Amino acid sequence: MSNSAKDGIVANRVNAGRVNDFVIKLANVNGSGSASANSLLMKTVFRMGVPVTGKNFFPSNIQGLPTWYEIRVSKEGYLARSGRVDVMVAMNSQTYARDLAEVAPGGTLIYDSSWPRDRLLARADVTVIGIPFARLCNERFSKARTRVLMKNMAYVGSLAALLDLDLEVVKTLIEETFARKPALIGANMEAIELGRSYAAEHFDCPLPTRVARLDKTAGCIMIDGNTAAALGCVYAGATVGAWYPITPSTSVMDAFKSFCERYRKDPETGERRFCIVQAEDELAAIGMVLGATWNGARAFTPTSGPGLSLMNEFLGLAYYAELPAVVIDVQRVGPSTGMPTRTQQGDLLAAAYASHGDTRHVLLFPANPREC
């Protein structure tokens, strides 16, 4: 690895090397468009046949605050959080100190060296690599927003070189991701190549920590819990969904609608054989579900803790009237409004003793997407 790179900065090459068994953490700014790039990175590893999982750590705001995305690569299929970070991509200068401290001994930190911070980002047991993502994108793209967005794809390109990712898989995923917006494919491909070519030219690639093709994901799909729950509703015969948007459950109904558009239409006429209603509040949503089940339909509603509280009266009605309603509670943290972008298991007793009087509800606790 060259220590004389013009723009790249390399310090203390100590990468111990972990093939198909490491954690990548990406430090970004919320609202900077990094979600698509991070998802693309994870899907690339999956398409290369290696078990992988992702975890988002993000604030309850629209943009501006720090956000992190963690990807665990595990050839053995261990997909829970491991507690270590082997490769850190630090794209937020506000969190440099924290990001550097999280890297495991022998790990690697990659940062945007458009503004060199080699003195700030220094640790004897960590390899620090600087790549000028902002400068590369500023020189290539003219629109300000495009420059911000393409920085994310540029670091995916650099990681493709550094981690030995299959570039053809990356390109295929870009084409799939932006199939409905073909005008964006070219710019994203350019950004990938910017990052890849810079890393390949200035550093020894791949790193000792890298991805090698396996065949352990054959016959598998990549899916999160909310999407899996929505797919389960389709397989279970649900035709009615009523809801009121609330984080972190909103994507359940988004996914259910998407699946219904594919699998709940009359094959001859194209008519929809499903009903999805956005109610005025959670109490109305559960009321619509009860009305649907009373008329013989299989119906459900997704919600979170505050919504579950509002549904208590009608949950008692469902018990008393023997209506088989399904409530999917995607839990957040805390009482009252709580923390919508954090998770815990604080709703268990509320779900078990929902409504007043003597009632009993069947409670199911999925431990993984397959059980959803």
In which residue ranges do the predicted regions lie?
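Thiamine diphosphate
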Residues: 21-103, 240, 247-353, 365-371
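Active-site oxyanion-binding pockets that recognize sulfate/phosphate
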Residues: 181, 362-366
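Flexible glycine/proline-enriched surface loops and loop-helix/loop-strand junctions
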Residues: 357-361
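Active-site cofactor/cluster-binding pocket
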Residues: 2-236, 240-242
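Hydrophobic transmembrane signal anchors and adjacent membrane-proximal interface regions, especially
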Residues: 126, 234, 245, 274, ...
